[in-house]
Amino acid sequence: MITFLSSQEVETEQYFTLFLPALKEREYDGFFSPKSRAKIMSEQERKHVDGCAIFFKREKFTLVQKHAVEFNQVAMANSDGSEAMLNRVMTKDNIGVTVVLEVHKELFGAGMKPIHAADKQLLIVANAHMHWDPEYSDVKLIQTMMFVSEVKTILEKASSRSGSPTADPNSIPLVLCADLNSLPDSGVVEYLSNGGIADNHKDFKELRYNKCLMNFSCNGKNGSSEGRITHGFQLKSAYENNLMPYTNYT
């Protein structure tokens, strides 16, 4: 039985009329957010805007928090005067969604205990859809950085509320799902896999992002970059290293 599902490119109308009702019958609950452009559209047009969704088994988890991350808003708030950030990243309306779930005690087997000393085990599931165009490798990479940075903030706040003594980004399990629109040798995959990336990586296309990129590093705005933008998570891919024959079949 599938514990949770993460989907991208789900149309708003399809989420509310097809996916959510059908999955609720199978004991799932869900969270969905459309791309940012939906805010300025008519009700009829809004139905056809796609977004990201997360579904989870109600018998296994209780929803504690839910968050939508609009990349254009994060870009605007962290532009620091970068024209590239405003003209290339902020103009794309991709989004991500995150849920903080409490794991039901019944799921722990004999001898198993929550990671925290507190009697509550949380799990975070995050799902995002990055920009598609190969000519915008910089945008894909920065969107990924922004999302991971926002997830880190959500995780730290959830960790402090759950009674954890630290805000270690690895103190709560994280499942990160995404349509990265990126190949295995891309800066996006390098950043996620290696814990960081050089601030002069070729995927930035030599554009002037350096100052604002530090806003998304685990060192923070006042930290020392040492030429790298880092995220602090210990991520491991659920896929094999080999390139899949296809990721979309029509």
What are these regions (language model features)?
Residues 3-7, 208-211:
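Acidic, proline/serine/threonine- and glycine-rich low-complexity intrinsically disordered segments
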Residues 2-3, 171:
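Short, high-confidence coil segments that cap the C-terminus of an alpha-helix
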Residues 1, 116-124, 156, 192, ...:
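Intrinsic structural disorder
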Residues 24-29, 135-250:
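Metal-dependent phosphoesterases centered on the DNase I-like endonuclease/exonuclease/phosphatase
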